UniProtKB/Swiss-Prot annotation:
Catalytic reaction(s) noted: carbamoyl phosphate + L-aspartate = N-carbamoyl-L-aspartate + phosphate + H(+)
PANTHER family noted in UniProt: ASPARTATE CARBAMOYLTRANSFERASE, ORNITHINE CARBAMOYLTRANSFERASE, MITOCHONDRIAL
Record InterPro entries: Asp/Orn_carbamoyltranf_P-bd, Asp/Orn_carbamoylTrfase, Asp/Orn_carbamoylTrfase_sf, Asp_carbamoyltransf, Asp_carbamoyltransf_Asp/Orn-bd
Pathway: Pyrimidine metabolism; UMP biosynthesis via de novo pathway; (S)-dihydroorotate from bicarbonate: step 2/3
Name of the protein described by the UniProt record: Aspartate carbamoyltransferase catalytic subunit
Annotated GO biological process: 'de novo' pyrimidine nucleobase biosynthetic process; 'de novo' UMP biosynthetic process; amino acid metabolic process
Residues reported to bind carbamoyl phosphate: 49-50, 99, 127, 130, 250-251
Residues given in the record as L-aspartate binding sites: 77, 161, 211
One term of GO molecular function: amino acid binding
Protein family: Belongs to the aspartate/ornithine carbamoyltransferase superfamily. ATCase family.
Domain of life according to the entry: Bacteria
Native organism: Sulfurovum sp. (strain NBC37-1)
Pfam families, per the entry: OTCace, OTCace_N
Amino acid sequence: MQHLVDTSNFSDAQIVQLLHDAKTFKAQRPPQLLRDKLIITLFFEASTRTRSSFEVAAKRLGAAVVHLDPSRSSTKKGESLEDTFANLCAMDPDGVIIRHEENEAPGILADMQMTSVINAGAGNYAHPTQALLDLFTLMEHFEGNIEGKTIAIVGDIISSRVASSGIRLLRRMGMNVILVAPEPFMPQSDLPQYENLEDVLDKVDVIMSLRAQLERHASPIFDDYNEYARHYCITEERLGDRNILILHPGPVMRNIDISDEILEDPRCKVLTQVKNGVYMRMAILKLLLLDSNN
């Protein structure tokens, strides 16, 4: 039984296999490889892209999907997460996909060894499927070679599980990572750090913009989102004609994170990320629910 709590759960060979399978699934509609599988989704936090993407991925592979709404579950009556999970596992699902506000939640459930656990986002520490779909998008764009390329992660990095997982995976795959944020948004890190976005534009091949989560910070850093945008919004004026790939995990705050014009620019791959998310999650489900059990 294998789990995906973070990308470190996968070997280099497995990541290569995921990239191959995602590319294959994107090129042609796959057979229903998981037609006898049952997956339960358990999202304790809001999700548009990740939950929908997983459900589409599972159904395209033929799996049945059951969604448990925590707001209407016995967790509201005081049942613990572990007991909720154990009761779900008594129904013999082949996997449980969980999003939770606590960093440790997916790992706690995985350690119970009752069914395969897939982390769909936990706290501010890990969002492994987002990191893997971003890797797929980058490998596709750079024709399979990202080693030595430089990515700037811009925005509220300290609050971002996307940044945490992405940094670990992209460094592992040979990319250079630099961080761009005001000091309160910056995590402790040995990576190069900049406060001024303009200082990195001639150094990078890719910018990953993150949503500014001002609500997560106790003391005001900016007066409002418009002030943040004046410093960190990815705009046509800032980019000029530089050939920089633009990514964002969503939801995008238009004209705060990325301008309307850049969202329509061919350098921006936000919707490609969403599309690739389905194929990468198909590959992940195949690996965990089929290949790992053979």
